[in-house]
Amino acid sequence: MTPTELKRLYRIIKVQLEYGLDDLLPDHQLAKAPRWMRKSLFWLKNQHPEKPLGDRLRLALQELGPVWIKFGQMLSTRRDLFPPHIADPLALLQDQVSPFDGALAKAQMEQALGGPLETWFSDFDLVPLASASIAQVHTAKLKTTNQEVVLKVIRPDIRPIIDADLKLMRRMARIVAKAMPEARRLKPIEVVREYEKTLLDELDLRREAANAIQLRRNFTDSEELYVPEVYPDFSNETVMVSERIYGIQVSDIAGLKANGTNMKLLAERGVSVFFTQVFRDSFFHADMHPGNVFVNPEHPENPQWIGLDCGIVGTLNSEDKRYLAENFLAFFNRDYRRVAELHVDSGWVPADTNIDEFEFAIRIVCEPIFAKPLCEISFGHVLLNLFNTARRFNMEVQPQLVLLQKTLLYVEGLGRQLYPQLDLWETAKPFLEEWMMNQVGPKALINAIKDRAPYWAEKLPELPELLYDSLKQGKAMNQRMDQLYQGYRASKRQQATGKFLFGVGATLVVCSAILVDHTYEQLSLATAIAGVTFWLFSWRAYRR
């Protein structure tokens, strides 16, 4: 380790001990070193003994900085790995840090764009509109159109910090996985690797710009969701320019009510937006926490969601969508056998899984949930319980499903915060059933034909020539097959002749031996010569 890494490691250990996080350590040989540190570094006492363990963990991660804050946010979504008293406080982590100098932000943008900001923008505000651990946002106007925009810029000093902390995380994960077999269930190496990929993706604003453009295209002219326009000419790896929007934050219930918002319709539209993204587009915003969701203040009787920060998105393939939809429908029809079979069919659990045992495990977990009225059942927690049960049957972690579960919990939480009587199942079931009908039966066939229509329109003019070539090739193939068959027949005849001649020759040789014993020497010699002659003919027959 370099001196810088050792200094950072000491800082991490210091914060952990000051928040009493050594309480998280199991009774294991590996835990002796931190406990020895606790005794040796006697001046580092637990300064928050009165706080619950989950809150202490949250505060420690917040103090350690951006990499650890985002790591805690990711861990809060892995409820298949962590109990509620740990995951719930982590969900409250706030990704807000002190802003850096606006003049430095401007210089960073000018370097990325290759010229003074005044060339393209007016009214650039040096005071940031918002500041987070990875990036900072400033406002301005486009000179050509006078359109208000926001400029998002990556912090100039963030990459070395991230690289150093990720290196320490990887090292600690390897140590834990190697020395503590019982901790392998938490998959520390895989969790850190997944987090590293997510975090590094957020450092490339080109990815966020592409995601926002795609999501905006998917909801063009939609009354349900609006995604601000991105200006790709002014966007690159470290800077992104997009349309500035004005809205009411979705968590501002008082503000929404004061604006006369139709809260029931707003909540239902949130559910509709989620299922549309998942099942129609196979592309969904996977970071829909309240800070990224606003409501258009215009037309409060017909409210529209506004989605920001598309840095994290999820995708599902057609098989995942079909199995997910069938799982939901089977769940709410209490067909647990079908749920178990779908998990095996999809490959989410091993093919040799005992269906009866799996069905029984799902039934035990889910029946208590369905004892409540449907309007009180959490879709997200149904999915969570399903994944937790499947993990006991060796279900591999499916990153796309983890993102889906996190997003569903966000959407459901927001929906019930807006309208506590929201019946998610009543809103979602018609959507799922219609989607399933579009995937099977006559309607699906018609859609498939429509999808392939451009291909057939291109190929139809070539059909006569293709048909002629096929017939010509078929005729040539038949002739070739006839030739091969005739050759095969001739070969079989030759082999039969050879066997016959060999048999005759062998018989004559045996006869010559018998005749010698009976003093018919001349006849015996003639018979032997004839036998050898027949052998020669049989050998020639085999050689052809």
Curated annotation (Swiss-Prot):
Q: Which residues form the active site?
A: D287
What family does the entry list? Belongs to the ABC1 family. UbiB subfamily.
Location comes to: Cell inner membrane
How would you classify this enzyme at the top EC level? transferase
Source superkingdom? Bacteria
Q: Which residues cross the membrane?
A: 496-516, 519-539
For the ligand (ATP), the binding residues are L129, A130, S131, A132, S133, I134, A135, Q136, V137, K152
Name it. Answer: Probable protein kinase UbiB
Instruction: Name the job this protein performs.
Output: Is probably a protein kinase regulator of UbiI activity which is involved in aerobic coenzyme Q (ubiquinone) biosynthesis.
Q: Which GO terms describe its biological process?
A: regulation of ubiquinone biosynthetic process; ubiquinone biosynthetic process
Principal location listed in the UniProt entry: membrane
